[in-house]
Amino acid sequence: MQFDVEKIKFLRNKTQAGIMDCQKALINSKGDIDQAIIFLRKQGIKKASEITGKILGEGLTNVIIDNNEAVLYELNSETDFVAKNKIFLDLLNLLGKILLKETKPNMNIDEILNLKFEDKKIKDLLLEKTAIVQEKICLRKVIKVIKKDDENFGMYKHQNGFISVLVITKNSKKDVSEDIAMHIAANKPKFINKEQVDLETLNQEKSIIEAQVNKELGNEKTFNIKEKIIEGRLNKFIQNICLIEQSFVKNPEQKLRDYLKEKEVEIINYWRLEVGERI
């Protein structure tokens, strides 16, 4: 059975499937375009589910803000080539709209993947795009945030989404919140201040520093001198991981806490996503 080129072309544009797949779908549906589209979708999902699970270390992050709500998320692919593909980028933007509207704070990824958009679950949408690009696409992280009326959002994206940051501040103008978000992207803090640093983190780092100092100095220095060196290095470690103790990225001579004091701004919370982090 032969079909005219225009019908195949229309089906390709509609589904982004290959020529041979479009021909097969038209044969199966006896030329019915709607049935051919259904056939291709079913075949695509079947193929996508068979694609083996490689480590998805590429992709993009994104952050979207709408009034008091924001969503931060990471969409992964196997290769950088697919992450730059229009199909992937369109999916990234579509997911942002869906996630901003449909998700709630503290939803787990399984709950999110089972959310429906136009009678289609998010996980099925991902499978469809996986079938088209012939490479697994995965929604790995989603963070939904709701702020209070008297708080401010700030956001920053580095390298078109390799890193995305969202920050909540109080008494802050837009440019100040964005500067703080940019600083977080660059300096990768783990806590806002010293008080948030947990005992497990401190003890783990202290044991590492103690081992380093003992190896470096051996029996050359007294216990008290070693303790002072260990204390100094531990304080330096705390400064490096605590946001407000870090040197401000736009003015390294100034601590971020001094910049915040100068601007009379308080940091409430922040979130930072980097592609492939902790995979």
UniProtKB/Swiss-Prot annotation:
Checking PROSITE patterns in the record gives:
EF_TS_2
Cellular localization per UniProt = Cytoplasm
Q: Which InterPro entries match?
A: EF-Ts_dimer_sf, Transl_elong_EFTs/EF1B, Transl_elong_EFTs/EF1B_dimer, Transl_elong_Ts_CS, UBA-like_sf
Q: Which GO terms describe its cellular component?
A: cytoplasm
According to the UniProt record, where is the region Involved in Mg(2+) ion dislocation from EF-Tu? 79-82
Q: Is Cytoplasm among this UniProt entry's keywords?
A: yes
Q: Which Pfam families match?
A: EF_TS
Q: Which residues cross the membrane?
A: none
The answer to whether the entry has keyword Cytoplasm is yes
User: Which one of the record's GO molecular function terms can you name?
Assistant: translation elongation factor activity
Which controlled-vocabulary keywords does the entry list?
Cytoplasm, Elongation factor, Protein biosynthesis
Identify the PANTHER family for this entry.
ELONGATION FACTOR TS (PTHR11741), ELONGATION FACTOR TS, MITOCHONDRIAL (PTHR11741:SF0)
Q: Which family does it belong to?
A: Belongs to the EF-Ts family.
The record's function comment reads: Associates with the EF-Tu.GDP complex and induces the exchange of GDP to GTP. It remains bound to the aminoacyl-tRNA.EF-Tu.GTP complex up to the GTP hydrolysis stage on the ribosome.
Q: What is the protein name stated in its UniProt record?
A: Elongation factor Ts
Classification of source organism: Bacteria, Bacillati, Mycoplasmatota, Mollicutes, Acholeplasmatales
